[in-house]
């Protein structure tokens, strides 16, 4: 009887050991958690990896690219099998990719493409299309007048993609003399304070004669709204953003912001999680729908479609998707 019990305990131990070894470690490097949307990305990514039987090791760089490099080194020492990066800097993060590859660890660039690197996969939305969605909505609402573009970080490839999309729509209006692009600048950190300061500068330079402002994201847009309010221009200037942050969707309900763009964050995060775990287990990757050039290679990519959000479709978009709750939006 004791012999049978001993073999039974040994058998259970082997099963548990096998389960433990299958719980692959995935590293997640996040540039910052200062905006609510990145907190959602982190939450959904961790949940998805856990459901797939993996474990996530997270490090947040607080917008410091050297700190992010050090964090990558630390995670690699902890024997991660795949590294997912939301880069602080789209250029300097190439060093992290090389470092990971030296440890035979594949890298997924999440939402922001790492340029001039051998990054293995890219998961994001079509940011050119997002820029087009912003500009299409604005030109339908404000087909003539003075426009300002306050873009995202100068270090982020997404900012350039958004601008290209915006200009695809705006350029014909500009050439016909219907729209004047009187202000265009990129921020450093996609921040509310930068949006506020640049909007103040834009208004001062143009004697408050601005008809539309397209912001790189909702944090920037919120800063723009602050500047407009200070100058008595609430609801007089059309403002667009991106990310469908709760406070901005509330401003859309109030009529202060005209639209935002919602990225399907839950799907993005779960897609990245699935690829990360498959890479860690040496499984075949499928589902990539395009390849995107980063200056060094055509990166196998999954680009998801974003949704424009305005006061008429909030319930059919961000609420239906489960991203925001009706009781939070309609206070």
Language-model segments: residues:
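Hinge/cleft segment of the Venus flytrap/periplasmic-binding protein
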Residues: 154-158, 170-171, 271, 275-331
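Flexible loop/hinge segments that line or gate small-molecule binding clefts
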Residues: 91-129, 136-140, 146-152, 245-253, ...
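Bacterial signal peptide processing site
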Residues: 20-22
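Periplasmic-binding protein-like
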Residues: 27-29, 79-87, 106-110, 148-151, ...
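Sec-dependent signal peptide recognition
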Residues: 2-10
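Hinge/beta->alpha junction and helix N-cap segments in small-molecule ligand-binding domains
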Residues: 29-42, 58-67, 88-89, 112, ...
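Hydrophobic alpha-helical
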Residues: 87-101, 166, 188-251
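C-terminal motif of bacterial Sec signal peptides marking the signal peptidase cleavage site
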Residues: 16-18
